[in-house]
């Protein structure tokens, strides 16, 4: 595995939790760096995204050069890390590409995705307007948002408590990589009950309503240290991922029954996406001028719309593949030529079974 320092830190920690750290060789590559695995060579181009050190990949092959840009946005004030490297992307296009793979997440969204900079100010203002205990839930991997939540607490005289194992893990790795350096030490969740409700802010996992995440346990009254009551507030600093509406709704209903105020991106400016909207996609097409676009990172309707949108905006050719399909990009026109096994696997004793297979379906029914 080749990755930037932050991703390597996450991977090493996950592997160590399962006893696999010695079985997976990991090579750390600096942001903007590169590596070779013959017959391929790969160069990194820094991109702004909600996860630190996100990189586009310029993959050199004997058949041509491919640009893979999965998660990115054009954020003038990303807060952690550099802005998206326009010069590097232009240079990749000028060298000549066979194809570009590109993020499709926000292809239905007009305009330009918001910036983390103004969001930080807004989040502090929203917290300032609350009088009771405040919980902010977010994607744990969004270190810039975590830092914004911490700074919102500090600006309003509140101590910060992290609740959720993934938040602790990512905060530790972020600090090891040089992030979150100006943030205070966190309060242990066991000590929250000794603090005045208006003097604490809790960062919690579970923005998507995950059953065993911290926020769901707090909402159900199952958390051993954290309780909420009327006058408290939960801020969802995240988007509602399609398919998670019911689980998020269950958590929000449980909170509402306790008299907790719920604030989402529909109510206040508390979230921005980490993915490009239509104006940014147009800009990238102009910088790179890809001869062929392969839309990635989205459901079928996103990929199909991105294909249509790219053709409408001057990209000469597009192609689309589904998970497990093998696509030949060159020589000749792009086409699917094979299939490989894909999808999630579950561990059943000492064997791997398909996550959607009969074994796991039967256990869920039981």
Predicted regions and their residues:
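C-terminal regulatory/interaction regions
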Residues: 151, 155, 174-366
């Amino acid at each position: 595995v080749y990755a930037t320092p932050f991703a390597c830190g996450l991977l090493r920690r996950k592997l160590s939790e399962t006893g696999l750290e010695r079985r997976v060789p990991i090579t750390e590559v600096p942001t903007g760096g590169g590596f070779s695995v013959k017959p391929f060579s790969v160069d990194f181009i820094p991109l702004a995204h909600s996860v630190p050190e996100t990189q586009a990949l310029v993959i050199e092959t004997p058949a041509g050069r491919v640009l893979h840009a999965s998660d990115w946005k054009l954020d003038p004030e990303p807060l952690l890390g550099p802005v998206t490297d326009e010069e590097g992307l232009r240079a990749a296009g000028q060298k000549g590409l066979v194809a570009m793979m590109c993020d499709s997440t926000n292809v239905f969204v007009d305009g330009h995705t918001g910036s983390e900079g103004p969001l930080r100010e807004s989040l502090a203002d929203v917290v300032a307007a609350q009088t009771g205990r405040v919980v902010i839930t977010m994607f744990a991997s969004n270190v810039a948002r975590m830092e914004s939540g911490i700074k919102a607490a500090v600006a309003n005289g509140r101590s910060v408590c992290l609740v959720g194992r993934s938040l602790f893990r990512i905060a530790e790795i972020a600090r090891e990589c040089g992030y979150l350096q100006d943030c205070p030490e966190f309060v242990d969740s066991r000590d929250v009950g000794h603090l005045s409700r208006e003097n604490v802010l809790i960062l919690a996992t579970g923005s998507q309503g995950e059953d065993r995440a911290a926020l769901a346990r707090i909402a159900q009254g199952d958390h051993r240290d954290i309780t909420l009551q009327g006058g408290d507030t939960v801020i969802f600093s995240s988007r509602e991922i399609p398919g998670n509406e019911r689980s998020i709704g269950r958590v929000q209903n449980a909170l509402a029954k306790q008299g907790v105020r719920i604030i989402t991106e529909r109510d206040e400016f508390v979230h921005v996406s980490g993915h490009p909207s239509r104006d940014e996609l147009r800009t990238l097409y102009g910088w790179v001028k890809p001869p062929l676009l392969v839309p990635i990172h989205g459901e079928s309707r996103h990929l199909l719309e991105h294909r249509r949108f790219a053709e409408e905006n001057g990209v000469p050719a597009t192609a689309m593949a589904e998970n497990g399909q093998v696509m030949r990009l060159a020589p000749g026109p792009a086409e699917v030529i094979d299939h490989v096994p894909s999808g999630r696997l579950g561990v059943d004793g000492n064997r791997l079974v398909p996550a959607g297979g009969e074994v796991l379906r039967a256990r869920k029914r039981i």
